[in-house]
Amino acid sequence: MASRKNQLAIDNDELMRRVEALINASKNRYRITVQVANRAKRRRYEDPDDIEDGWMKPIRRAVIEMSDELTEPEIIGDE
């Protein structure tokens, strides 16, 4: 468990930069917030074992994943 934590853990400053990048890249702040929340919720139900481990909260993981996919416009599109 410790090795996974070290691989994907980011500090709060980096997480906030990623959140700001997501919001700035989106035309609609509310819509991107809902998309991140829905991804976190979906992830929570798809992989309940990760939640029990507690190594990374679903919302943090969703922000990291979506910010990594920022280069794909359909992720944050308004359609």
Swiss-Prot record:
Give the record's family classification: Belongs to the RNA polymerase subunit omega family.
Which key words tag this protein in UniProt? DNA-directed RNA polymerase, Nucleotidyltransferase, Transcription, Transferase
Tagged with keyword Lipoprotein: no
Supply the enzyme class, top level.
transferase
Can you tell which superkingdom this protein's organism belongs to?
Answer: Bacteria
InterPro entries named among the record's database cross-references: DNA-dir_RNA_pol_omega, Pol_omega/Rpo6/RPB6, RPB6/omega-like_sf
Name the EC number(s). Answer: 2.7.7.6
UniProt record, GO biological process: DNA-templated transcription
Q: SUPFAM superfamilies from the xrefs?
A: RPB6/omega subunit-like
Q: Which residues form a coiled coil?
A: none
Q: Gene Ontology cellular component?
A: DNA-directed RNA polymerase complex
Return the NCBIfam families for the record: PRK00392.2-5
Q: How does it assemble?
A: In cyanobacteria the RNAP catalytic core is composed of 2 alpha, 1 beta, 1 beta', 1 gamma and 1 omega subunit. When a sigma factor is associated with the core the holoenzyme is formed, which can initiate transcription.
Q: Which organism is it from?
A: Synechococcus sp. (strain JA-2-3B'a(2-13)) (Cyanobacteria bacterium Yellowstone B-Prime)
Protein name, per record = DNA-directed RNA polymerase subunit omega
Reaction(s) this enzyme catalyzes, per UniProt? RNA(n) + a ribonucleoside 5'-triphosphate = RNA(n+1) + diphosphate
